[in-house]
Design a protein with these regions (language model features):
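Alpha-helix capping and helix-coil boundary motifs
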Residues: 1, 58-61, 76-77
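A short, exposed loop/beta-hairpin motif centered on an aromatic-Gly-Thr core
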Residues: 44-64, 68
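Short N-terminal "domain-start" leader segments
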Residues: 1-35, 39-40
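Short arginine-rich
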Residues: 67-82
């Protein structure tokens, strides 16, 4: 069975806010990485409205984007990270 998605819990060190980073396959050649602000138990506050979302075309790009966002959200201010992507 092929992997269908990734899921990471992230605690932002500068702001102490919690986020959930999720990458899922939407179509055969379309992946979506979404960042949700989370509560203390790492449950997203708004399931239908992610705070940030990026679409990629290949699985490798999606996985790289997922791990890149996870690493940056741990160390940098979220607004700064979200501003850098269209």
């Amino acid at each position: 069975m092929a992997a269908k998605g990734l899921f990471n819990k992230v605690k932002n060190l500068p702001t102490r806010r919690r986020f959930v980073v999720s990458t899922i396959r939407k179509d055969e050649n379309r992946f979506e990485t979404a960042v949700f602000e989370a509560n203390f138990f790492y449950l997203p506050r708004r399931w239908s409205k992610p705070d940030f979302m990026v679409e990629t075309r290949t699985r490798d790009e999606a996985w790289d984007m997922h791990f890149h966002l996870t690493a940056r959200l741990t160390q940098e201010y979220p607004a700064q990270v979200f501003k850098e992507y269209p």
